[in-house]
């Protein structure tokens, strides 16, 4: 059975689930779609870094350039939603920050996911993060920029989604806590 999860008319990309093959296929109707190439390069960079840090993980992606799609393995995991507050997602934010510290090389200029939010992470067994959706991948950005994006989006997106006029104080306090912990003692560019 085949199921179309979504199709973005603006980006001209979509996601299909093939249950018989146990794969997720990301495709583009635009043959010059750079985001699909970024997705493949970024995810494979991440897998290479991830593999060297975490054992017993075997993922294989397949880029079929001729037909403009990427096959990803089906990953059974929990998805966290961006509209949950930082307080609600605090456990997952902590896990993800620790994951970043373990996986990303400690160079001042590094690879960048480009859209790191809780929405773009799958959590196996509620604990092991797998970062997905690498379409905005870049090779040369400042180390920690993804965590900046993660923390800012964790307070802004729920506020916007719930149409609030301000960010609750508890959210700002948590933001400051994790920002300070992450960047304390780090030399930033």
Task: List the predicted regions and their residue ranges.
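Hydrophobic residues embedded in beta-strands of well-ordered beta-sheets
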Residues: 22-24, 68-70, 127-129
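Helix-rich C-terminal or lid/interface subdomains of diverse kinases
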Residues: 69-71, 149-152, 168-189
């Amino acid at each position: 059975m085949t199921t179309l999860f979504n199709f973005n008319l603006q980006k001209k990309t979509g996601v299909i689930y093939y249950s018989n093959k146990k794969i997720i296929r990301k495709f583009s109707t635009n043959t010059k779609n750079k985001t699909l190439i970024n997705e493949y390069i970024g995810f494979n960079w991440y897998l290479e870094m991830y593999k060297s840090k975490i054992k017993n993980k075997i993922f294989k992606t397949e880029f079929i350039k001729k037909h403009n799609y990427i096959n990803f393995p089906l990953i059974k995991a929990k998805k966290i939603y961006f509209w949950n507050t930082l307080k609600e997602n605090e456990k997952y934010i902590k896990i993800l920050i620790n994951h970043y510290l373990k996986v990303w090389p400690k160079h001042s200029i590094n690879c960048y996911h480009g859209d790191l939010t809780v929405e773009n992470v799958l959590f196996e067994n509620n604990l092991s993060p797998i970062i997905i959706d690498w379409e905005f991948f870049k090779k040369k950005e400042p180390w920690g920029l993804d965590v900046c994006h993660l923390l800012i989006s964790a307070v802004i997106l729920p506020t916007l989604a719930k149409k609030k006029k301000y960010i609750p104080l508890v959210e700002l306090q948590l933001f400051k806590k994790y920002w300070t912990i992450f960047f304390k003692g780090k030399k930033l560019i």
